UniProtKB/Swiss-Prot annotation:
Organism of this sequence: Homo sapiens (Human)
UniProt domain Protein kinase: residue ranges: 88-481
Pfam families: PX, WH2
Name of the protein: PX domain-containing protein kinase-like protein
Gene: PXK
Keyword entries, A-Z: Actin-binding, Cell membrane, Cytoplasm, Membrane
PANTHER family: PX DOMAIN-CONTAINING PROTEIN KINASE-LIKE PROTEIN, PX SERINE/THREONINE KINASE PXK
GO molecular function: actin binding; phosphatidylinositol binding
Function as written in the Swiss-Prot or TrEMBL entry: Binds to and modulates brain Na,K-ATPase subunits ATP1B1 and ATP1B3 and may thereby participate in the regulation of electrical excitability and synaptic transmission. May not display kinase activity.
Domain notes: The protein kinase domain is predicted to be catalytically inactive.
Amino acid sequence: MAFMEKPPAGKVLLDDTVPLTAAIEASQSLQSHTEYIIRVQRGISVENSWQIVRRYSDFDLLNNSLQIAGLSLPLPPKKLIGNMDREFIAERQKGLQNYLNVITTNHILSNCELVKKFLDPNNYSANYTEIALQQVSMFFRSEPKWEVVEPLKDIGWRIRKKYFLMKIKNQPKERLVLSWADLGPDKYLSDKDFQCLIKLLPSCLHPYIYRVTFATANESSALLIRMFNEKGTLKDLIYKAKPKDPFLKKYCNPKKIQGLELQQIKTYGRQILEVLKFLHDKGFPYGHLHASNVMLDGDTCRLLDLENSLLGLPSFYRSYFSQFRKINTLESVDVHCFGHLLYEMTYGRPPDSVPVDSFPPAPSMAVVAVLESTLSCEACKNGMPTISRLLQMPLFSDVLLTTSEKPQFKIPTKLKEALRIAKECIEKRLIEEQKQIHQHRRLTRAQSHHGSEEERKKRKILARKKSKRSALENSEEHSAKYSNSNNSAGSGASSPLTSPSSPTPPSTSGISALPPPPPPPPPPAAPLPPASTEAPAQLSSQAVNGMSRGALLSSIQNFQKGTLRKAKTCDHSAPKIG
């Protein structure tokens, strides 16, 4: 069934869970308003960044749209008079930067369509509700028994997954929910295997899996129909929310924070672990556990959205577990996500940050033990326990489950192999992303350490020591040159600089072989040496080049005339008479 066009070849499927960061680089004042130039970056790569230009009115419009979340966001107030003043603009820029920091670090806000469109209009300009409605309408042309009642706008967190309330024409009182989603970045199944597996989902029967009434797919999207549940999901129970309300309204800022009772935590936790173990044993990748993907049917939890991994959609908690290199399989991802879910069931809210350093008081220490094994620093660093290990822990081991429904989910061998290969590809991309994040964190830490106050002080001390050492060497060199100059001036032409190992140059006069007389005391201003001292000066230069300054200075100070050998000359200047 071709109810949606196939995406063009080479289309890049974005991972919507990769965080966006935003920094205001500059502001520019025009005639009546100020524009702020913002650098937006996707993930850790500086190359994957772009500039956007926004006015204060754009921020104000975004902030009004986000009011549904019930949060008090720090948008700087409006100012009608004096809003073009330079100091005011600089102060407002700081306030807007703080506002951007808040909305990009809030896990729910940062993933919502409003914020994505504000920061990345090129990739999020499409109206996905309209697109989904068009494709669903095309689908109904060949399946006339279904009818759309109304769109369930923004009830989920995914930007590219839309929901519609449905009914069957011959059963008008019965309500169903249709979900439509396009492909994600982790879709590695072939088109044929993908469509076969999607159509296989209605045959999956398990007491803790919410049944799929109808499912179909083509090369680029999938459409599934399930029964509508008035009670909603486990997250709706925890937050006391209405299932049809928008995601931001339901979960961003709950009015009352209260966890579940201990028996509920034990029972729901055991049921969820049992269905995860069932999927793992079947070789079916999941990786999408969170409280909104668990439907409540009486006192029974039933898992939703098995199609997500087939579509290649990224996990709700991906930005958390991508930070930890030991959480690198879909099984360990499910265990880590179970830790998040257990925390929400226990405390009525998600953890402020992960890993969790210390846990608040819980209804039982057995709860804390499971939380520590999945969310603590040690667990995130060393790795997750298995599902079987969690089932053996005291919190769940004594829970008795009573169900008469026998699990059924037959996957052909060929499709099992396709699932195995797809699972390996999903894990490979995760490992590569974790590696890049780890390298980036190390580099950032090194740069931060290099620029820290302590490091700057160390570098100043080293520079000071180097400067002192250089000054001392220059002083010694100057002293050696000064002594050299004094000795040369005092000895005149008849006393060249020598060392014990230096040969004595022969006399150029050719008259006397006697040693030179003692030099007179040096005058205040010594005259320049005559031309006859060129040979000693050259020898002195060679001596300086051949030995250290200290040895030369010592040689000069210890010089004794008595050590000079007498020179013998033969006078051949007299005329010969033959």
